[in-house]
Amino acid sequence: MIEGLQEMLKRDFNITFKDVDLLDAAFTHASYVNETPERKKKLKYYERIEFLGDAVMQLCVSEYIYEHYPEMPEGKMSRLRAAMVRADSFSKFAIECHFNEYIRLGKGEEKGNARQRPSLLCDIFESFIGALYLDQGKDEVVRFISKVIFPKLELGWFDHMMDNKTELQEVLQQNGECKIKYNEVNVTGPDNERVYTMNVVVNNEVMGEGTGRTKKAAEQMAAYQALKKLRK
């Protein structure tokens, strides 16, 4: 199983671990160790590495938000980071990376379909990040999540957790009823790489404009720009 994991990481992410035992531990569940008594003293499992991976993800995501959203208020930065490092987000990333296929489980956990359990998938994703950090450092972690996670911001992947449109509506309605409308301003790029520009109009006044890979993502950015304008 570890050989298949190494091949996948090299093929899909150009990652080659120097310490293969560390990678092995990152994908080993305690149930597997407990059911292998003759190797119990030698085998390690992921929980301590996961602890480190959680902290590394918090740092890397915080740095990315700080650098790429220089005018975002601290409160919104915290909400965005929370959305990006949620357990359900990590479990989806793990499946997207096919990590669930390489977890070493005990027979009982395997029968219980633990391989698809969101909490375990979240743990494995964090454990992989911790192992990658120990093996190759923070820069390699950033390179990996720049491929797996950060592009999802442009695609509006976290919109349901960071709803600028709803926040804008709530802020505006504090001062009474108002008419909010989102309009398509421009569309560029080929069919498979569309970039949309949308604006938000409040009582016939353009309050913000944003771009994104989907109309919904562009609308969220337009709402964010409108919120910035209102806070000035």
Swiss-Prot record:
Superkingdom as given in the UniProt entry: Bacteria
Residues in DRBM domain copies: 163-232
Sequence ranges assigned to domain RNase III in this UniProt record: 6-137
Subcellular location: Cytoplasm
PROSITE patterns named among the record's database cross-references: DS_RBD (PS50137), RNASE_3_2 (PS50142)
Enzyme Commission numbers on file: 3.1.26.3
Coiled coil: none
Keywords: Cytoplasm, Endonuclease, Hydrolase, Magnesium, Metal-binding, mRNA processing, Nuclease, RNA-binding, rRNA processing, rRNA-binding, tRNA processing
GO annotation terms (biological process): mRNA processing; regulation of gene expression; rRNA processing; tRNA processing
Oligomeric form and interacting partners: Homodimer.
Cited function: Digests double-stranded RNA. Involved in the processing of primary rRNA transcript to yield the immediate precursors to the large and small rRNAs (23S and 16S). Processes some mRNAs, and tRNAs when they are encoded in the rRNA operon. Processes pre-crRNA and tracrRNA of type II CRISPR loci if present in the organism.
Protein name: Ribonuclease 3
Lineage: Bacteria, Bacillati, Bacillota, Bacilli, Lactobacillales
